[in-house]
Amino acid sequence: MTTEKENVTTAVAVKDGGEKSKEVSDKGVKKRKNVTKALAVNDGGEKSKEVRYRGVRRRPWGRYAAEIRDPVKKKRVWLGSFNTGEEAARAYDSAAIRFRGSKATTNFPLIGYYGISSATPVNNNLSETVSDGNANLPLVGDDGNALASPVNNTLSETARDGTLPSDCHDMLSPGVAEAVAGFFLDLPEVIALKEELDRVCPDQFESIDMGLTIGPQTAVEEPETSSAVDCKLRMEPDLDLNASP
């Protein structure tokens, strides 16, 4: 009888212990779920505050990578890795202006945020998939700061004045001169066109000395054969057709 009571008591104790352990386990699961939910809410809040830029990806270790697609070669061009998303976005905007000119879609407005010098060079530290054809693009510093690109002083002065040199006016009609002067007023368009032409046609024509001369300096080679033809003048008879026979 005593043994049976002990077994019942042990069974009840085991049952109570199992329920208690299960209750403790359930509390632990709920606590972990609450912590996970709180972290998720916190991460969501941070993500909602972060601004996303075109052409910029955030690395898991915190840096920002920028890249752009070459519209001609249809390949991705690596622009570099930056400390902040804004620096990476500026690098993308500079590359977009290089590739598409004033029609580029940028992260920041072209007017007001970017001046004439906004057409900053593109880093030629390209991905291995890009051919060497893009190697002639100007550089961007390793720290992400764009190097200044020189602009033709004559072109800048002409664009600021909005006028053409006098010798050009002499050769053009008033209507054509006015239209050309209006073209030079839009300096970003001129720079974009020049850069596009330089990128598409990088080769330039240069004069080559072929060693040919015309005139008294032309050298005449004598024949090497000894059988030279001896040409003698033929004496024509002095005939007077008007004389009487």
Swiss-Prot record:
Q: Which domain of life is it from?
A: Eukaryota
Feature: DNA-binding region: 52-109
User: GO cellular component terms?
Assistant: nucleus
Where does the secretion signal sit in this chain? none
List, in alphabetical order, the GO biological process terms annotated in this UniProt record.
Answer: ethylene-activated signaling pathway
Give the Gene Ontology MF terms in alphabetical order. DNA-binding transcription factor activity; transcription cis-regulatory region binding
Per UniProt, subcellular location reads as:
Nucleus
This protein's UniProt keywords: DNA-binding, Ethylene signaling pathway, Nucleus, Repressor, Transcription, Transcription regulation
Q: What is its main location?
A: nucleus
The UniProt annotation puts motif EAR-like (transcriptional repression) at 239-245
Q: Can you tell me which family this protein belongs to? A: Belongs to the AP2/ERF transcription factor family. ERF subfamily.
User: What is the role of the protein in this entry?
Assistant: Involved in the regulation of gene expression by stress factors and by components of stress signal transduction pathways. Transcription factor that binds to the GCC-box pathogenesis-related promoter element. Acts as a transcriptional inhibitor and may regulate other AtERFs.
Entry's free-text remark on domains:
Contains a slightly degenerated ERF-associated amphiphilic repression (EAR) motif, which may be involved in the activity of transcriptional repression.
Name under which the protein is recorded: Ethylene-responsive transcription factor 10
User: What is the scientific name of the source organism?
Assistant: Arabidopsis thaliana
